[in-house]
Amino acid sequence: MAATSEKQNTTKPPPSPSPLRNSKFCQPNMRILISGGAGFIGSHLVDKLMENEKNEVVVADNYFTGSKENLKKWIGHPRFELIRHDVTEPLLIEVDRIYHLACPASPIFYKYNPVKTIKTNVIGTLNMLGLAKRVGARILLTSTSEVYGDPLIHPQPESYWGNVNPIGVRSCYDEGKRVAETLMFDYHRQHGIEIRIARIFNTYGPRMNIDDGRVVSNFIAQALRGEALTVQKPGTQTRSFCYVSDMVDGLIRLMEGNDTGPINIGNPGEFTMVELAETVKELINPSIEIKMVENTPDDPRQRKPDISKAKEVLGWEPKVKLREGLPLMEEDFRLRLNVPRN
C-alpha cells in the first residue's frame, strides 16, 4: 500500500512529443497554438511570432471578444492557420507550444457573461492542458494581476497570495484565473507538463476593443468623440500601464526561458486615474472636461507590479513610456472611429 502511495506522488517526466513530429515527412518548424489569438494581445503576439520564418502559428478563437480583422494580414499565409474554436471544447491538433490567452479580460464582457468567463478559465485551461499532455507541448498561461485582488502589499510581488472577494461580481475572472494557475501547477507536478505562468498587468495599445470599458480605451474614445472623460470615484486609485509590444516581448521571453513562473509582466510606472485622464486630455483633446462618476464594486485601490523577478530571470523590462504609447493607440482609434485630425 505504501509503495502504491509513493508511486502516485512521484513527479513524472515530461511527456514526449508525438512521434509524427519527428518523422522525416515533418518540417522542423516550431508549431505554435495561440488560444484567443484574434484578440488584442493575442493578435500582436501572432505578428511577433510570424516574424520568425521557422514558426508556424495556429490561432483558435471563438470571436467572443476577438476579431478576424485583427489577423487579416496573415489569412492565407502558408505558415498561418485560423480555427474558429471555443476552448471549452477539446481541440485535437499537433503543436510544440501553446500560448493560452483565451478569456474575456474586460469587466464589461466578463460581467455580461460570468458563467462563460469561469468556464473558459477552468474548462478551457483543462482542455489546453490536456492537449499539452497528449502532444508533449510546453504551455504558457496568461494569468492576471487580478489574482492579487485589492492588494494589501504594494507593489505586488509574485509571492503575495492576494486579497480577493471569492463571490463578488469580478470573481468569475479573478478566481477563475487563480483556479487556472492551480490546474497548471497540478498538471506540472502530476504529469510533468512544461508550464509557464505570466501574471499580466494592465496592457494598452492598438486593436483594443473601443467600447470594452477598460480605462485607457474609454478615455481615448471619449477624447476623440469630444465627450467628457469619466473617472470613477475617488480618482486616486492607481494602475500601471504596459504597452502591448513590451507585453508580447515578455510573454515570448517567458515561454522560451527556463522558469515556470508565475512572473509579473507589467510596467511599474504608476498613475492615478485622474493623472491618466489629465494626460489623455493634454495629448488628445485639451478642450474636454473630466467628470467624476460612481465606481463599480471591488475596484482595487492600487495596482503596481514588482518586476524584480522578470528583470532577473527573463532580462525583461518595459521600454515604452505611457506618453509614447498613448499617441500610437490614438492613431489606431482615429482610423477605426473615423475621426480626422483637425
Curated annotation (Swiss-Prot):
<dbReference type="InterPro" id="IPR044516">
    <property type="entry name" value="UXS-like"/>
</dbReference>
<dbReference type="GO" id="GO:0005737">
    <property type="term" value="C:cytoplasm"/>
</dbReference>
<keyword id="KW-0520">NAD</keyword>
<feature type="binding site">
    <location>
        <begin position="232"/>
        <end position="239"/>
    </location>
    <ligand>
        <name>substrate</name>
    </ligand>
</feature>
<feature type="binding site">
    <location>
        <position position="202"/>
    </location>
    <ligand>
        <name>substrate</name>
    </ligand>
</feature>
<dbReference type="Pfam" id="PF16363">
    <property type="entry name" value="GDP_Man_Dehyd"/>
</dbReference>
<feature type="binding site">
    <location>
        <begin position="61"/>
        <end position="86"/>
    </location>
    <ligand>
        <name>NAD(+)</name>
    </ligand>
</feature>
<dbReference type="InterPro" id="IPR036291">
    <property type="entry name" value="NAD(P)-bd_dom_sf"/>
</dbReference>
<feature type="binding site">
    <location>
        <position position="170"/>
    </location>
    <ligand>
        <name>substrate</name>
    </ligand>
</feature>
<keyword id="KW-0210">Decarboxylase</keyword>
<feature type="binding site">
    <location>
        <position position="214"/>
    </location>
    <ligand>
        <name>NAD(+)</name>
    </ligand>
</feature>
<keyword id="KW-0456">Lyase</keyword>
<feature type="compositionally biased region" description="Polar residues">
    <location>
        <begin position="1"/>
        <end position="11"/>
    </location>
</feature>
<dbReference type="GO" id="GO:0042732">
    <property type="term" value="P:D-xylose metabolic process"/>
</dbReference>
<feature type="binding site">
    <location>
        <begin position="215"/>
        <end position="219"/>
    </location>
    <ligand>
        <name>substrate</name>
    </ligand>
</feature>
<feature type="region of interest" description="Disordered">
    <location>
        <begin position="1"/>
        <end position="22"/>
    </location>
</feature>
<feature type="binding site">
    <location>
        <begin position="299"/>
        <end position="303"/>
    </location>
    <ligand>
        <name>substrate</name>
    </ligand>
</feature>
<comment type="similarity">
    <text>Belongs to the NAD(P)-dependent epimerase/dehydratase family. UDP-glucuronic acid decarboxylase subfamily.</text>
</comment>
<dbReference type="GO" id="GO:0033320">
    <property type="term" value="P:UDP-D-xylose biosynthetic process"/>
</dbReference>
<feature type="binding site">
    <location>
        <begin position="173"/>
        <end position="177"/>
    </location>
    <ligand>
        <name>NAD(+)</name>
    </ligand>
</feature>
<dbReference type="GO" id="GO:0048040">
    <property type="term" value="F:UDP-glucuronate decarboxylase activity"/>
</dbReference>
<protein>
    <recommendedName>
        <fullName>UDP-glucuronic acid decarboxylase 3</fullName>
        <ecNumber>4.1.1.35</ecNumber>
    </recommendedName>
</protein>
<dbReference type="GO" id="GO:0070403">
    <property type="term" value="F:NAD+ binding"/>
</dbReference>
<comment type="pathway">
    <text>Nucleotide-sugar biosynthesis; UDP-alpha-D-xylose biosynthesis; UDP-alpha-D-xylose from UDP-alpha-D-glucuronate: step 1/1.</text>
</comment>
<comment type="function">
    <text>Catalyzes the NAD-dependent decarboxylation of UDP-glucuronic acid to UDP-xylose. Necessary for the biosynthesis of the core tetrasaccharide in glycosaminoglycan biosynthesis.</text>
</comment>
<feature type="active site" description="Proton acceptor">
    <location>
        <position position="173"/>
    </location>
</feature>
<dbReference type="InterPro" id="IPR016040">
    <property type="entry name" value="NAD(P)-bd_dom"/>
</dbReference>
<keyword id="KW-0963">Cytoplasm</keyword>
